[in-house]
Amino acid sequence: MFILNENEKEYRFGDSGPKYLMKGPRANFAVVQFQPKQDFDPHYHEIMEENFFILSGKVDIVVDGVCHTLKTGDFIHIEPNEVHYVVNNYDEPIKMVSVLAPFQQQDKCVVEDYNKEQFKK
């Protein structure tokens, strides 16, 4: 058992990206923040499933080529091997929770030839 305040951790890119509160041994738990117009590389996981819960703001999450606009209070579950791309097309930062399980040290497969420009506004 442990208790942690999110302020004890830092976002990967200063004011954005994931902030992992827990990495393993069975799951990853992160608070994720994207600034306006910021995105994250299209990718998939071979083993892990990923879940996002939107804490504040609005974000577009593209799963297997279908764009889903999510807002505060929305939840999305992404299965292994589903290519997903996250982009904040809006004027306010987005803050969400990300949970990945089962924990894998390396399970992110970036999709290099993905046409992400079609999903940017």
Residue ranges and their predicted role:
Residues 30-45:
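Conserved short histidine dyad/triad with adjacent acidic residue
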Residues 25-27, 47, 91-92:
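Short strand-connecting beta-turns/loops that link adjacent beta-strands
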Residues 25-27, 58, 66:
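Well-ordered beta-strand scaffold positions
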Residues 80-106:
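Ligand-binding loop in jelly-roll beta-barrel domains
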Residues 47-49, 54-59:
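Glycine- and acidic-residue-biased ligand/ion/polar-headgroup-sensing regions
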Residues 1-28, 108-121:
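A short, N-terminal "cap"/entry segment at the start of jelly-roll beta-barrel domains
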Residues 39-41, 60, 76, 80-86:
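Histidine-centered metal-chelating micro-motifs
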Residues 65-80:
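Short acidic-glycine-tyrosine-enriched beta hairpin
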